[in-house]
C-alpha cells in the first residue's frame, strides 16, 4: 500500500486554467511553473478503452507539497462536471501496477490510467474508493525527473 508521506501534490480540475491560476495564486501567494500542454495525452478507461485527449497542467512552485491545476476536455477525468469536487492527491509509487491492483482488490475503482492493464497502466492511474468522492492519482516514480525539471522551469 502506498505511503502517505509520498504525497507530493494536491490537484484540482478546472474549466479555465489561466483564470484559476490568477484567482488562486493571488489569494494564496503562489507562483506557477509554465503551463504544459499535452496535445496527445494517452488515457485508458474500462469503459472507453485507449484514447487520446488534450490536457493542460500546472504546478505551484511552492512545495514540497505542490498545488496542481488541470484543465481537460468535457467527459474526461479532468472535467469538473464529472468530478464536481475536482480534487485529488498525487502520490509517488515505485510499482504502479502493484499499487493499482492492491486498490482494485480493496474495492477501489479505476477511473483512468495512462496505459492499458497489459501495459501495467502506463505511468499514472486515477483511483476512487468505493464510498467517497475522493481521487488518488498514483504516479510512477519514473516520472519524478520530468516533474522535478518542470518545477524548476523559468526560475
For the regions a protein language model found, what residue spans apply to each?
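Core segments of cupin and vicinal oxygen chelate
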Residues: 2, 13-62, 98-121, 130, ...
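Vicinal oxygen chelate
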Residues: 7-15, 58-65, 79-96
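A cross-kingdom feature marking solvent-exposed beta-strand/loop segments within repeated
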Residues: 36-46, 74-78, 84-86
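Ordered, amphipathic secondary-structure segments that act as subunit-interaction surfaces
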Residues: 64-72
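Short, charged/polar, Gly/Pro-enriched secondary-structure boundary elements
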Residues: 77, 131-136
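Acidic/histidine-enriched, glycine/proline-rich intrinsically disordered or flexible terminal extensions
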Residues: 135, 139-155
Amino acid at each position: 500500500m502506498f505511503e502517505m508521506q509520498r504525497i507530493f501534490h494536491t490537484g484540482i480540475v478546472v474549466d479555465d486554467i489561466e483564470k484559476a491560476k490568477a484567482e488562486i495564486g493571488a489569494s494564496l501567494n503562489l507562483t506557477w511553473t509554465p503551463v504544459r500542454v499535452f496535445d496527445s495525452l494517452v488515457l485508458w478507461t474500462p469503459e472507453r478503452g485507449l484514447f487520446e485527449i488534450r490536457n493542460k497542467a500546472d504546478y505551484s512552485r511552492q512545495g514540497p507539497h505542490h498545488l496542481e491545476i488541470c484543465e481537460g476536455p468535457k467527459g474526461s477525468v479532468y472535467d469538473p462536471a464529472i468530478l464536481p469536487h475536482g480534487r485529488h492527491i498525487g502520490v509517488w509509487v515505485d510499482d504502479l501496477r502493484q499499487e493499482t491492483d492492491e486498490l482494485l482488490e480493496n474495492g477501489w475503482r479505476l477511473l483512468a490510467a495512462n496505459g492499458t492493464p497489459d501495459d501495467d497502466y502506463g505511468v499514472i492511474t486515477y483511483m476512487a474508493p468505493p464510498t467517497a468522492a475522493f481521487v488518488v492519482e498514483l504516479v510512477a516514480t519514473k516520472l519524478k525527473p520530468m516533474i522535478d525539471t518542470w518545477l524548476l522551469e523559468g526560475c
